[in-house]
Amino acid sequence: MALHDMEDFTFDGTKRLSVNYVKGILQPTDTCDIWDKIWNFQAKPDDLLISTYPKAGTTWTQEIVELIQNEGDVEKSKRAPTHQRFPFLEMKIPSLGSGLEQAHAMPSPRILKTHLPFHLLPPSLLEKNCKIIYVARNPKDNMVSYYHFQRMNKALPAPGTWEEYFETFLAGKVCWGSWHEHVKGWWEAKDKHRILYLFYEDMKKNPKHEIQKLAEFIGKKLDDKVLDKIVHYTSFDVMKQNPMANYSSIPAEIMDHSISPFMRKGAVGDWKKHFTVAQNERFDEDYKKKMTDTRLTFHFQF
């Protein structure tokens, strides 16, 4: 779809945005069309960036980080929906606008969001020595969550059947590319830059400990009472009911929650309800090959 067609694009509940490649990574066409602007994004030293592979706990981490910065003031986080509070750097969606424009209009300090692999990160974020939080999730649960997200999100390609999507994901032919390369790229970068690398499974198992770790990285000293408050307000059940965090304000023509809610399970080990024995064996074999060159390890269940 050409750029002039995209400008006239309107969601009607059936159409989906087209995709293309940027430096070998699949992206929505609108992102490809403004790639030079994204690459040349000018960061500020006090910008805080939250980076994840899609469906690895991004929204959860955003809410936690903002509550840490606001020292547990829940009302401040209710001022606007998630997508308005945290500019999504590389995203441009008809009717919702551009993350770049949002970021430019936002006063400092800004909390920014990206799903970009490390090698495609706008250089100024590293040049300005910005603090970056990366969250990684085990690939089996990540795949399941991404599959259901693509079912309901018309801004991304239709995923096809679960069997088809399983193959697409393994091949890395999804938006934002290969999960394996994404988590490894950020892992390799973490000791060279101001990057705090967290795991979704650790956040589920011991949220208070991980929130404390985040607070220390951000530079906030929070007492136990505030930490407990943040744990409560960022729990899955509370966030699922929070209209400022559950994406229910996005028009149904773009995100159809009747197909699958944005916040579906938020669990560790849900993949076991989707993977067949044969798929699991195939996945494990593929995982072993692709992860031999890293010490990065994941928990697939508790």
From Swiss-Prot:
Keywords: Cytoplasm, Transferase. Its main location: cytoplasm. One of its GO terms (cellular component) is cytosol. Substrate binds at residues 113-115. 3'-phosphoadenylyl sulfate binds at residues 55-60, 137, 145, 200, 234-239, 262-266. Its EC number is 2.8.2.1. One of its GO terms (molecular function) is sulfotransferase activity. It holds the Pfam family Sulfotransfer_1. It catalyses: a phenol + 3'-phosphoadenylyl sulfate = an aryl sulfate + adenosine 3',5'-bisphosphate + H(+); 17beta-estradiol + 3'-phosphoadenylyl sulfate = 17beta-estradiol 3-sulfate + adenosine 3',5'-bisphosphate + H(+); bisphenol A + 3'-phosphoadenylyl sulfate = bisphenyl A sulfate + adenosine 3',5'-bisphosphate + H(+). Optimum pH is 7.4. It is an enzyme of class 2 (transferase). Gene3D superfamilies: P-loop containing nucleotide triphosphate hydrolases (3.40.50.300). InterPro entries: P-loop_NTPase, Sulfotransferase_dom. It is found in: Cytoplasm, Cytosol. One of its GO terms (biological process) is xenobiotic metabolic process. The active site is at residue 115. Expressed at high levels in fetal lung and kidney and at low levels in fetal heart, adult kidney, ovary and spinal cord. Sulfotransferase that utilizes 3'-phospho-5'-adenylyl sulfate (PAPS) as sulfonate donor to catalyze the sulfate conjugation of phenolic compounds. Can also sulfonate estrogenic compounds, however, the dietary flavonoids (phytoestrogen) and environmental estrogens, like bisphenol A are better substrates than 17beta-estradiol (E2). Mediates the sulfation of doxorubicin and its analog epirubicin, two antitumor anthracyclines. Belongs to the sulfotransferase 1 family. This is Sulfotransferase 1C4.
